[in-house]
Amino acid sequence: MSPRERVLAALRRQRPDRIPKHFDLAPAQEEEFRRRTGSDDVSEHFNLEPRFVGISATSKPRDFSEYLRDVPDLDHHDEWGVGAISSGFHHFERMVHSLRNARTPRDIAAYPWPDVLASYRWRNLPADVRCWQQRGHPVSAAPPGACGGSLFETCWYLRGQEQLLIDLYDNPDLATALLDTVNNTLIESARRLAEAGVDILRLGDDVGSQRAMLMSPDTWRRWFKARLATVIAVAKRVKPDILVFYHSDGNIEPILPDLIEIGLDILNPVQPECMDPAQIKREYGDRLAFWGTIGTQTTMPFGDPDEVRRVVRERIETVGPEGLLLAPTHVLEPDVPWENIVAFVEAVEEYGAVAPA
């Protein structure tokens, strides 16, 4: 199988020739990778199958000075106006919520929203998708959002997490205006990504904590379910075979039936410290594929290479072979030993071959 055939078979819960794999590196790990390998291409070096595309950078940045002028130690902000203050420790930053002082829907309407739907930013996307597909790779893309989030995360990055959760109860008109503004961008972006031919539509919001959800399941259903359902429906109407991927750290098992109902195909990352991957596979494996399952709170930073190999083999046996793309459950941070990264790749290669049915 080509990498694209392998990934699409696995994520459609069919039998691949071997288990596909993926991981991302934090900036310090990218530097270590370049130092050790002399390469700039992690995916090519480690034979990681997926490829990722996105829209072009803006040529018309907005002016957020009105929203950030009271932050003297601001380092930078993204195109949505979400500011960042360096922690002085690796890539970690403190976030500045540019809509933290908003009071009414008028404040949301007056905000200088980025030009993420401008046609010039989407012009190269179809060719980028075709390029990777013609080279045999599956293509994944996410609608543009603040700091890579979709609905909940983009909104709370702008507003502040605690404040947004308060708004859902105490200022529902403002919450509705903010959620609808962001979701309308997601809807149109999902349509364009489907039209461009991407194989996998990536959505994601961390709505889970270590033991439970960040909000009650009913609150999520009231405010987020229908909006995400519209995003997914638009993409599948344009491209019925598009696969929908949803990322949330933490334990979100209470809403898995809801996500399946609105069209989810792939759950990521299935944190083993929060949800048992084998149990999730037993309960939902006839309706969901899984991307992740290798713990980055346990195995990858604190295990040794033998432990990494053992866990990889266990996941293949209990969650695979159909419906599994093996990956660490988070970007690999500086605390992950290089030897464990190599062990992960080697273990998937060693144990990941799948015999024909």
Feature annotation, model-predicted:
Residues 1, 33-35, 42-46, 79, ...:
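N-acyltransferase acceptor-side catalytic subdomain
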Residues 30-69:
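Segments that shape or occlude catalytic/ligand-binding pockets
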Residues 64-114, 135-138:
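A contiguous, low-structure linker/loop signature
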Residues 1-26, 30-35, 77, 108-357:
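Active-site loop segments of alpha/beta catalytic cores
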Residues 15, 46-51, 69-72, 133-136:
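Short, solvent-exposed loop/edge-beta patches enriched in aromatic
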